[in-house]
Amino acid sequence: MEYEVLSPWSEVDTSVLTGLTPRLDTLEGKTIGMYGDFMALATKMLHVVEEELTRRYPGIRFSYLQYEEETSEIAKDTAFRPKFEQWLGGVDAVLSFYGSVPSGALFLGYNSALMEQLGKPTVMLTVPRTYPTAIRGCKAKGVPGLRTVQYDVAVDKINSHVTLEEVRTAMATDLPGLTDALVSALT
């Protein structure tokens, strides 16, 4: 008998690579999609980012969506996909959080790549330890250059026990990177 062995980390079929959607020229007056993965901390982080961006851009608006499936692709979820597409149609760009565990980071990469492929400038936030896995997810779906900001969680607790104040303190240094990733020209 002869067997063929396949690796989930195999080479990407580059015939389906997708270029990045142009960034926004400003955040003023725009609606930002706030996408959170299944972790409770993702929603806390998104709310902190909303508070800060609202201070800087008074006309900015936000629309939230959380996908509570840890290891599922929105593209293949026939029950959730219509809700996702309706939400995505109402935003100008997406901040996609947060990929704190490897399995979640891989699927955050898959789902963030889908947002970019559907024409929305997307910025994905991950922690350094899961960044390579999240990027593999993006590459596997044909968006190898997805803009990503790494967030080094300064609090070593179970996600659900992190307070909003701890998130505010940690996110203060990362907000400029998120803003730049949404509006800076592609290089």
Enumerate the language-model features and the residues they cover:
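Metallocofactor- and cofactor-centric catalytic cores in central/energy metabolism, strongly enriched
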Residues: 1-118, 126, 131-141, 148-168, ...
